[in-house]
Amino acid sequence: MADLAKIEEQLSSLTLMQAAELVKILEEKWGVSAAAPVAVAAAGAAAPAAEAVAEKTEFEVVLTAAGDKKVEVIKVVKDITGLGLIEAKKLVDEAPKPIKSNVKKADADEIKGKLEAAGAKVELK
C-alpha cells in the first residue's frame, strides 16, 4: 500500500505536459488509447440528463408579475388557491411568488392560461 501512495504522490506532482507525455508513453507500451473511454463516458453521462428532463411530471406555477389588470389577477389567484381576498392580494403584491406547487403538466398549463387571460405573467418551473 505504501508503494501506491508513493506513486500517487509522484503522479500528483507532474505538470500537465509531463502527464500528457506519460499518457502517450503508456498508450504505446500497453497498446491502448485513452480517447475511447472518455467518449463513452461522456455519452453515458448525457443519457440520464435527458431522461431527467423527460421524467418531470410535477410543476410549480409561479406568478412573475400581476400586469395591468391586477384586480382580475387577484380574483383568479383567489379562485385557484382558495385563499381569502386579502391573502390573494398579498400574494399578488409580492410577485414573483409560487401560486401552486406539485401540479401535473395539464393542470399547470390550465392555471397558467387562466392567469395569463387575466393579464398576469406566469412561469412554469
UniProtKB/Swiss-Prot annotation:
Fetch the SUPFAM superfamilies from UniProt: ClpS-like, Ribosomal protein L7/12, oligomerisation (N-terminal) domain
Organism, scientific name: Rickettsia africae (strain ESF-5)
Keyword Zinc in record:
no
| Function noted in UniProt | Forms part of the ribosomal stalk which helps the ribosome interact with GTP-bound translation factors. Is thus essential for accurate translation.
**One cellular component GO annotation, for this chain's record?**
ribonucleoprotein complex
- HAMAP family noted in UniProt: Ribosomal_bL12
A GO BP term here is: translation
Which Gene3D superfamilies does the annotation name? 3.30.1390.10, Single helix bin (1.20.5.710)
Q: Name one GO molecular function term.
A: mRNA binding
Pfam families reported for this sequence: Ribosomal_L12 (PF00542), Ribosomal_L12_N (PF16320)
Instruction: Provide the family line.
Output: Belongs to the bacterial ribosomal protein bL12 family.
Q: Which UniProt keywords apply?
A: Ribonucleoprotein, Ribosomal protein
Query: What is the top-level taxon of the source organism?
Result: Bacteria
Q: How does it assemble?
A: Homodimer. Part of the ribosomal stalk of the 50S ribosomal subunit. Forms a multimeric L10(L12)X complex, where L10 forms an elongated spine to which 2 to 4 L12 dimers bind in a sequential fashion. Binds GTP-bound translation factors.
Keyword Ribosomal protein in the entry? The reply is: yes
Q: What is this protein called?
A: Large ribosomal subunit protein bL12
Q: Matching NCBIfam families, A to Z? A: L12 (TIGR00855)
